[in-house]
């Protein structure tokens, strides 16, 4: 057959690799990453496109390049006379910068790319996205007391700096989306005051997908995290979800007689560096989850640290050289490390590490009523481990991954609430455990180690020695599939 033979018969048509190109959810006025599709000629005849155009011209914000030709204003957002020989193909590139829509929820943005053959036959590919109006902040410096409280998402470029005499308050329900170069540096005070129903969310700004099954929001290293400098004190992160950072929370060395950070009912998840790193600081962690970090979930180098009713789960999926759930050393001097009613676990056989100090430096620490994936202490330091459950790494029925409701390594989805098989159930001390868990569920007379109090599904009543009669609440998801969100 002559590949140079072109037909004008309407019996022949092109084949598209998709009939609808979805560009995920995007922030209005912010360019999307480029997506592509292919146009194939499998008809047996050569075909000419007399016209390719955007149906709405420049009204939707889509930008299209067809086989190297940009459909811009000079060409009237169209092109013509494109040959697609038999068994050949052309590639189409699509981007979107959507205009503001004035709405508080994502709005559908849609256009059709129309392909008209010489025969007059018209074919189309639908271009579709959801556009979300956002407030854009660039290199924000807080020099006086300021509250950020927005119904719309806030996208941060370049970062936020809180001056030494200023307090930045993040109101409940606030969502901050950080670009890759952005984070928060605190010289003064940061107060993130989320609630159980409306947490503050700090995350990266990419709403698209790396793969169809994997949103970038589940990929670590998307932004730069929070740094509390030496002059910063009295910081509060309450009901705050911090995820997909590089280093999440760093505390510089400072006066340990003043509390530097109180982390309460919060989540730190999926970090390409460490989760929390405290260098000779006063740190309190309560009812919180720190999980899946390339570095240590929690690392303490001296200072004064109190940990209660918290979960440290080291299941970082992107690198087998992940560190531990907890590392501590005396650093320049340790006042105390006191861990109570908490769960330390992960993939490795030992996820709790410490560096023995020089004889001149004390290392006062203690673990009470904790579940720990580490070797049982047999030295004189065993007196520092009181009512501790040591995980047996060979036991795969109730330790490690078996503690938790969902460890989905294929789709990188995690729910660190307790499963009914967990050895953390009833392992805490009723006298010192927090009265409610990270979700606001009341702890019973035999409380559980970690941030989550086990909730038995209704079908499984009675459970946990007939003492726990709670309906399972909806799981807190650490990530939102933006395609599902936008569909609502």
Predicted features by range, described:
Residues 42, 438, 482:
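Short, ordered coil/turn segments that flank beta-strands lining enzyme active or ligand-binding pockets
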């Amino acid at each position: 057959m002559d590949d140079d033979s072109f037909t004008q018969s309407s019996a022949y048509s092109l084949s598209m690799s998709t009939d609808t190109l979805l560009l995920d959810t995007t922030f209005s006025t912010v360019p999307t990453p480029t997506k592509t599709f292919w146009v194939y000629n499998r008809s047996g005849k050569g075909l000419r496109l007399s016209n390719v155009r955007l149906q709405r011209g420049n009204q939707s914000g889509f930008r299209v390049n067809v086989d190297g030709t940009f459909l811009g204003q000079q060409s009237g957002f169209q092109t013509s006379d494109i040959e697609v020989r038999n068994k050949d193909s052309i590639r189409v590139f699509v981007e979107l910068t959507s205009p503001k829509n004035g709405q508080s929820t994502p709005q559908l943005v849609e256009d059709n790319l129309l392909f008209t053959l010489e025969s007059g036959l018209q074919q189309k590919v639908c271009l579709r996205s959801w556009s979300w109006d956002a407030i854009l902040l660039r290199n924000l410096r807080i020099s006086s007391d300021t509250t950020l409280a927005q119904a719309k998402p806030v996208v941060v470029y370049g970062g936020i700096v809180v001056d030494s005499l200023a307090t930045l308050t993040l109101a409940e329900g606030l969502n901050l989306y950080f670009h890759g170069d952005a984070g928060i540096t605190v010289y003064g005070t940061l107060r993130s005051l989320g609630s159980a129903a409306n947490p503050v969310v700090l995350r990266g700004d990419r709403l698209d997908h790396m793969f169809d099954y994997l949103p970038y929001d589940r990929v670590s290293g998307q932004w730069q995290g929070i740094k509390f400098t030496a002059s910063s004190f009295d910081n509060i992160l309450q009901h705050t979800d911090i995820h997909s950072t590089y280093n999440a929370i760093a505390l510089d060395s400072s006066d340990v007689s003043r509390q530097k950070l109180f982390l309460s009912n919060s989540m730190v998840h999926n970090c390409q560096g460490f989760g929390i790193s405290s260098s000779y600081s006063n740190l309190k962690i309560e009812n919180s989850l720190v999980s899946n970090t390339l570095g240590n979930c929690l690392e303490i180098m001296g200072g004064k640290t109190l940990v209660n009713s918290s979960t440290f789960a080291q299941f970082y999926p992107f690198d087998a050289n992940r560190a531990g759930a907890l590392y501590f050393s005396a650093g320049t001097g340790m006042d105390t490390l006191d861990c109570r009613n908490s769960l330390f676990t992960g993939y490795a056989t030992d996820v709790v590490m410490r560096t023995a100090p020089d004889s001149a430096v004390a290392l006062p620490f203690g673990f009470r009523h904790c579940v720990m994936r580490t070797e049982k202490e047999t030295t004189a330091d065993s007196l520092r481990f009181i009512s501790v459950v040591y995980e047996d790494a060979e036991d795969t029925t109730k330790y490690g991954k078996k503690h938790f409701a969902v460890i989905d390594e294929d789709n990188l989805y995690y729910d660190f609430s307790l499963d009914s098989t967990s050895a953390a159930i009833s392992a805490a001390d009723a006298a010192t455990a927090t009265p409610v868990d990270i979700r606001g569920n009341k702890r019973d007379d035999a409380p559980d180690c970690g941030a989550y109090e086990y909730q038995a599904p209704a079908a499984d009543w009675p459970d946990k020695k007939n003492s726990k009669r709670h309906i399972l609440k909806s799981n807190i998801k650490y990530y939102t599939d933006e395609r599902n969100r936008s569909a609502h």
